[in-house]
Amino acid sequence: FNQFVATMDLMLEYNFAKADPLGADYDQGALELACGNVAFWPNGCWAWPNLVEGGADVNGEFGFISFVLGDDTSDFANNMIQASASKQIMVDKVQSTAEQQAAAKEFINYLVYDANGQKMFVEETALIPAAKNNPNAPLDPLGKDIAERTAAGLLYTSCFIAPSDHWSVIGAAMQKYISGNSSKADLASAL
């Protein structure tokens, strides 16, 4: 907890949106990085299209760094990057009709088994497929960086399973802290 808060405090101190961190605009973050006004933008490989739209040099050097937590250089979190499935596709069997479920399954099969769907998934969405049968390699520097780190064993995964009120409860506590309306002790108590 202490290491996480120290890292968050550092990011808040040296941030283009320091004056209003809760008002930071996603598109502005992409522009700031693409134009070279900031060195870091915490995000994932899916942000590549946003960077290109913001004017990033498609041949530029972009990649990921560890999300540093503390001063222990031997800590895996300080030497690797965290990567896990950020997008999940699910079929609703409660509120959707049988026809809608069939269409959803057909779409998933298109993404997983169809050559055009596989290619689109990787090249147009800038995502890295979980399905091992997809032969397409990332074309953008962010996807390439993750693929290289995966091959080198330099990433760790996290399984994000949280209670249904996670965002409303923990998110609210984090927003209070980030906006300067609570202390570190208040944040710890809320979490």
Describe the residue ranges of each PLM region:
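Beta->alpha turn/N-cap motifs
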Residues: 26, 43-48, 67, 85-87
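Long, aromatic- and glycine/proline-rich binding clefts that accommodate carbohydrate-like moieties
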Residues: 65, 121-176
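Short, charged, surface-exposed loops that flank catalytic or proteolytic processing sites
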Residues: 176-190
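Glycine-centered hinge/linker elements that transmit conformational signals in sensory
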Residues: 1-22
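Extracytoplasmic/periplasmic substrate-recognition and gating elements
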Residues: 14, 54-126
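Pocket-flanking alpha-helical
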Residues: 28-31, 48-54
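Alpha-to-beta junction loops
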Residues: 35-43, 60
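Short helix-initiation/N-cap motifs at beta->coil->alpha
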Residues: 20-34
